[in-house]
Amino acid sequence: EINRGEISKIFGELFFAVDPGYRGVAGEVSTQYANLHADSNEKFYIPDNVYIIGTMNDIDRSVDSFDFAMRRRFRFVELRADERLEMLANLNNEEKEAEAIARMSALNVEIAATEGLNENYQIGASYFLKLKNIDFDQLWSDYLHPLLQEYINGMYDEEGIMERFKKAYNQ
């Protein structure tokens, strides 16, 4: 997960080597660790065929320094909560799948309508895959309720907001 560390510091001297224009031997760099090699003149580069794939949770602000210089070296593909509903077919129960989609959709509408939250806080289908082993009530009490409570911690009328979330979930 790319926002779990300060990405510019993690890449350090390889900062430029990440850029597609500096890939391959043409972009080789000498790092501070060159003396650890048998040949201290040996250089490091990122091959053209190596792809760095990272995930990023927009609402996780544990580390908030993904600077623009580093950001422009990556392609961003947004995945919305409602884009992977087909994974719920893995529940192997069409009725449960339909109910999961209905509950997730209703809950996500309420989340997005809550002041201080937005679509980035919506619940994705992967949470509902837990329904293979638990029921809807346990999914709410053990997973969704604690997560949503954390989202709204410190907001005005937390209790009322949680009641609206639960009502939407239980529709």
PLM feature segments, named:
Residues 1-171:
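C-terminal regulatory/interaction module of P-loop NTP-utilizing enzymes
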